[in-house]
Amino acid sequence: VSPTPEPARLRTIPSRLLAGAALVADRLVGERLAAEDAHKWHFAVLVTLAEAGAASQAELSRRTGIYRSDMVAVLNELADAACIRREPAPADRRRNVISLTPAGRRRLERLDTVIADAQRELLAPLTTGEQDELVRLLGLLTEHHRPPHPRPQRGAR
């Protein structure tokens, strides 16, 4: 027995379609990462460190959108897995600088594969050109609505 279809008008509201696609995407990525004993915040921090280099906890929070209070737990988990190193900042020994370790780079390589697999599953109904166009359009929407100083979202692990 197939579910009752949504009313046609609901299937034409972009915000509703985006929300539905976001739920599916979040579930797919979350399940794939959980199978690797990881979550999307681990991935975000590892990517940020790999691309931008060592950073303070506050800078990582700004760049990833993860609240500072939540960042502590994420960094503790990554440190426990030897994926990051915390060292006192040369200019201010009260502050820590977080950097990626070789184990963190290997972990990121594995998570990159996991994320890519989830993206392939999510976007399977689309051609390569449609996938590229979707990414371009979503980027435009996101950039257009980005506040001047984005506030990190709470609890979106």
Language-model-detected regions and their locations in the chain:
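N-terminal leader segment of winged-helix/HTH proteins
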Residues: V1-E36, C83, P152-R157
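C-terminal regulatory/oligomerization modules of transcriptional regulators
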Residues: V1-R9, T128-R157
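Short alpha-helical elements of helix-turn-helix
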Residues: T12-R16, E36-V47, S69, D132
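Short, locally clustered residues in the helix-turn-helix/winged-helix DNA-binding domain
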Residues: A19-A22, V47-E51, D112, G139
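Helix-turn-helix DNA-binding elements, focusing on the entry/boundary residues of the two helices
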Residues: Q57
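The alpha-helix within a helix-turn-helix
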Residues: S61
